[in-house]
Amino acid sequence: MALEKELVTLTKKWFIDRDLEHGGRLDKQALKLSEEFGELCAGYLKQNEKLTKDSIGDCAVVIVGLALLIKEDVHSIFEESDNIRRKDAMDCFKLLNANISEFQLSQELASKEMCRHNLVRAVAYLKSISKALNYDFTDCFELAYNEIKERKGRWVEGSFVKEEDLPNE
């Protein structure tokens, strides 16, 4: 649990250091979460443990950014997620998909509290998927953080693009 808190803090700092508040857009970051969820589904379906673990962590990283964009306490979102548990991986995939979609649909229509609720549940389902697959959620999160911690790039129309993916200018 201490490592998870540290990873949340480090990931928050990563986003802040890259000026998420002025460069990031909620709609684009929500779409990024869908992209990472798609990779998680692909990893699971192909029984690719490395991709699955990496994608669980990548989803957690994006959720930190989303929480910052809606100006919510990221630590409390991750802590509250421990109160929700499911056992069946497929149920968790369905529920996570629904939560991501609901977040995207409600970001302009619903209250900030509803957006926060969807993030809490998304983290909970990621943790439940990890447990169902006999992975350690914190290990997955750490794997993803270690991959991005030195990453350079810039915000392009609200989405962070890593340096190697930027078009030649």
Spans of features found by a protein language model:
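Flexible "arm" and connector segments at domain edges
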Residues: M1-E169
